[in-house]
Amino acid sequence: MSVVLPFKHPSTILIAGPTGSGKTEFLVRLLQTRSVQPFPQRIVWVYGEWQNAYDRILQLRLPSVKIQFVKDFNEEIYDSLDRNTRNMVVLDDQMENENAHSKGGSSIAKFFTQGSHHRNLTVVYIVQNLFHQSKAMRTISLNSQYVVLYKNPRDKQQIECLGRQMFPNNPRFLTASFEDATKKPYGYLVIDLRPETPESYRIRTDVFDSNGQTVYVPK
């Protein structure tokens, strides 16, 4: 089934996959196709190490959009967000940053629990492991409205665990959908957990395909 469903602003997005799986490319396409609606007016990209893909982002033609790159997370980022502006904050490669997960101040978890609503914010967190063992990561995953999963040959249990949580009566459905979506190189599965999304449109892939997104529904 093919449909067209944009990512809605404000929202919380979690993207998980190993190095080189295509996570950053997903964000490039998300911006390039303006697949967030309404589209952000300010984008703050927090990174650990500079990547060539960032040069492509700076070259994107995004009229009236301010793009800022910041090396490493700091608490001032949250306070700089004007609620009268449509903000997007991308947190890339910040899992090992102690400041990003501090108990005090504006940790990443705060972006997911308060920022989206109070700061007119779409926050995107890019990680390698969906089930990283930390209290903050659990809070982030529970408050993610969109989850984008890439294939991780070394950790097949994360999708099985998620399948049991979301579809306890049919856990194999999510696993089968994920296997189909990721059988091609750089394939991914989008899990849409926004409350207004119809149940039949929650699991999908190929979200930037001009012919429409592919949707998976339980049999």
Question: Where is each model-derived feature located?
Answer:
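Pre-Walker A adenine-sensing motif
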Residues: M1-F7
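Extreme N-terminal starter segment of soluble prokaryotic enzymes
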Residues: H9-S11, Q41
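Conserved P-loop NTPase motor cores
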Residues: S11-S35, G48-N52, L62-F173
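Short helix-terminating capping/connector loops at secondary-structure junctions
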Residues: Q37-P40, R83-N84, K183
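AAA+/P-loop NTPase substrate/partner-engagement loops
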Residues: P38-L58
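A structural signal for isolated positions on well-ordered beta-strands in alpha/beta enzyme cores
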Residues: V44, T122-V124, L189
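Short, flexible N-terminal segments of the mature chain
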Residues: R61-K66, V70, F208-Y216
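Conserved GTP-binding G-domain of TRAFAC-class P-loop NTPases and closely related GTPase folds
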Residues: A136-K219
